[in-house]
């Protein structure tokens, strides 16, 4: 400081400028000291400063893997979307995903792993800290997909149960265990099952996590269930606000079944290597319950989950649907219309809720794609289709972010990593600044 004073005194014409410079330096240092990232509330006075937010964003900013214009892609600018799609075609074959061995190596030092991979390690607001969310995450392959999904939804106040398919490779299971071991609020389900597509085992995986999550000391109020091809399209803060607005109600697809879907519970199904239908007809549903259809995904209150596991009528329905086709697509939808389930909706068709009106999951179905001006609910998929569902491409991101859902399905970095990269960048920026890119 003495040398600065002598310098300023010697060049007295610069005195005012020198002291202004010193004041700016002192202010920046004081701001740095006030940016307490260990006890953080983005709504607090100190984090209203651009400096603190910039510093936090720089710490948590995800490394860009390509030079695409994510802001343009998010706004739906055709030039940016075209460049992103072309860039994806160029890099798709060259891109190397992280392997199980990579994660086993990275997680040898958990603190370094969490810092290097930019996990958010403190609640970003008091509102979020006081409203933890429970996750049931059912996965079976693609370790990088799982880690990126976990990173996108992770906050230290939430609680995460991971169900790993029992028939997944041993190296995959080891890598999942290694990742999970780095977080005190992430755990593997106590009971694992071998999941067969469209069979009861898919529901059982979620039920196993539900049981474990209810045993957790974390006072969560809502549960979201995910699979390995899901990704959030809202920040944790936005999710908390949406869940509070539900005020104890659930949100999941539940509609009167079309005639072609009723066969799913009219016949007995059995599992060999796959699920197959027998000629044996089933008895009617128990308690004269009315059947509804929906999908596997839910936004469900804690009370609803507790009743799923303990209510006698719910347990009878669970037993009855075990030998049906794709029971996850009618069990939750039917329970959501049962008057004895908390947060449910009445039976009347006016209370039907489509997947587009529910907030649980945003999906583009191939047979509904088309020209919006001619009545289609959404435009064509810019990625590819898998089992008649769009695996999103960069051209879908603008549309995705216009919707109110909490998560979307399906994403796959091997199909289009740019759409995921831009979505990750969007979510991280919005989590810190509260604004879009």
Swiss-Prot record:
Glycans are attached at residue 288. It is found in: Golgi apparatus membrane. One of its GO terms (molecular function) is acetylgalactosaminyl-O-glycosyl-glycoprotein beta-1,6-N-acetylglucosaminyltransferase activity. GO terms for cellular component: Golgi membrane. Optimum pH is 7-8.5. The keyword DNA-binding does not apply. This is Beta-1,3-galactosyl-O-glycosyl-glycoprotein beta-1,6-N-acetylglucosaminyltransferase 3. It comes from Rattus norvegicus.
């Amino acid at each position: 400081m003495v040398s600065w004073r002598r310098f300023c005194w010697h060049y007295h014409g610069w005195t005012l400028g020198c002291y202004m410079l010193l004041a700016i330096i002192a202010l920046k240092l004081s701001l740095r000291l006030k940016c307490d990232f260990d006890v953080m509330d983005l709504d607090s006075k100190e984090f209203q400063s651009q400096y603190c937010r910039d510093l936090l964003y720089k710490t948590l900013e995800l490394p860009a893997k390509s030079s695409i214009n994510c802001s343009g892609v998010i706004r739906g600018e055709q030039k940016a979307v075209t460049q992103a799609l072309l860039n994806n075609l160029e890099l798709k074959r060259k891109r190397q995903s992280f392997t199980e061995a990579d994660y086993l190596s990275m997680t040898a030092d958990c603190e370094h792993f969490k810092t290097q991979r930019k996990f958010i390690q403190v609640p970003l607001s008091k509102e979020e800290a006081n409203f933890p969310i429970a996750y049931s995450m059912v996965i079976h392959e693609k370790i990088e997909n799982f880690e990126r999904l976990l990173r996108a939804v992770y906050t230290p106040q939430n609680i995460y149960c991971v169900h790993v398919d029992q028939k997944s490779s041993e190296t995959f299971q080891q890598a999942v265990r290694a990742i999970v071991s780095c977080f005190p609020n992430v755990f593997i389900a106590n009971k694992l099952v071998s999941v067969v597509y469209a069979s009861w085992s898919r529901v059982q995986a979620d039920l196993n996590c539900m049981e474990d999550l209810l045993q957790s000391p974390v006072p969560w109020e809502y549960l979201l269930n995910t699979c390995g091809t899901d990704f959030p399209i809202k920040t944790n803060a936005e999710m908390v606000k949406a869940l509070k607005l539900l005020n104890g109600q659930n949100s999941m697809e539940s509609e009167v079944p079309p005639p072609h879907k009723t066969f799913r519970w009219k016949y007995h199904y059995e599992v060999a290597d796959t699920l197959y239908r027998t000629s044996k007809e089933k008895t009617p549903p128990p308690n004269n319950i009315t059947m509804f259809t929906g999908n596997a995904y839910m936004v469900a209150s804690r009370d609803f989950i507790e009743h799923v596991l303990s209510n006698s009528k719910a347990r009878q329905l669970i037993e009855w649907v075990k030998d049906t086709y794709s029971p996850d697509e009618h069990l939750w939808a039917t329970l959501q219309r049962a008057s004895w389930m908390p947060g449910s909706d009445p039976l009347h068709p006016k209370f039907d809720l489509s997947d587009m009106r529910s907030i649980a999951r945003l999906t583009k179905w191939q047979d509904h794609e088309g020209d919006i001006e001619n009545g289609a609910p959404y435009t064509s998929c810019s990625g590819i289709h898998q089992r008649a569902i769009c695996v999103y491409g960069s051209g879908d991101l603008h549309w995705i972010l216009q919707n109110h859902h909490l998560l979307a399905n399906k994403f796959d970095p091997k199909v289009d990593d740019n759409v995921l990269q831009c979505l990750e960048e969007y979510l991280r920026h919005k989590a810190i600044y509260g604004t879009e890119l």
